[in-house]
């Protein structure tokens, strides 16, 4: 059942340079990474937004909002997602962290001050619209580190099961899933 008042943002962009092909289209069981993430967000959120680069022409079964920048960094997708969200609270997940669960995302949302993230870094994370001005400023100034952009905000650290946070950057990483 979806949580009323929670937006889910799926970051489907990324150059996939080390991987060699779009990570969003890698299969895990019967689903691609993108399909799985979209489903998990749908289990939790009453609104879902996928953000990427329109020029990438990614073939996924849902609309992808162009992040509106030439920047290839997660901060661009987070800003675009927060701007488009109709809710004040958003969970943001990258497509290349395919083992995330509804429960893990719910824990991030429940703990969110301005931001809630695991100790490993700013994604996945929960972001309130109160974080948007700091993120927009960092992006406008070319400061592309999401971790640095949230440093001055009220950030909750949420310990999650590390096995859920496996990031797939190379074909060998898929075998660890």
Label each residue range with its predicted role:
Residues 2-164, 171-172:
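Nucleotide and nucleotide-moiety/phosphate-recognizing core
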Residues 174-177:
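Short, charged, intrinsically disordered terminal tails
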């Amino acid at each position: 059942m979806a949580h009323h008042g929670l937006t889910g943002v799926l970051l489907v962009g990324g150059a996939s340079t080390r991987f060699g092909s779009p990570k969003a289209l890698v299969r895990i069981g019967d689903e691609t990474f993108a399909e799985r993430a979209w489903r998990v967000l749908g289990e939790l959120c009453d609104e879902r937004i996928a953000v990427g680069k329109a020029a990438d022409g990614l073939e996924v079964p849902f609309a992808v909002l162009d992040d509106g920048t030439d920047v290839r960094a997660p901060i661009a997708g987070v800003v675009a997602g927060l701007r488009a969200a109709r809710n004040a609270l958003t969970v943001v997940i990258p497509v290349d962290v395919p083992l995330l669960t509804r429960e893990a995302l719910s824990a991030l949302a429940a703990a969110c001050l301005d931001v809630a993230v695991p100790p490993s870094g700013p994604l996945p994370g929960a972001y309130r619209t109160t974080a948007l001005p700091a993120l927009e400023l960092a992006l406008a100034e070319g400061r592309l580190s999401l971790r640095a952009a949230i440093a001055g905000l009220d950030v909750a650290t949420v310990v999650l099961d590390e096995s859920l946070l496996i990031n797939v950057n190379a074909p060998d990483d898929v075998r660890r899933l």
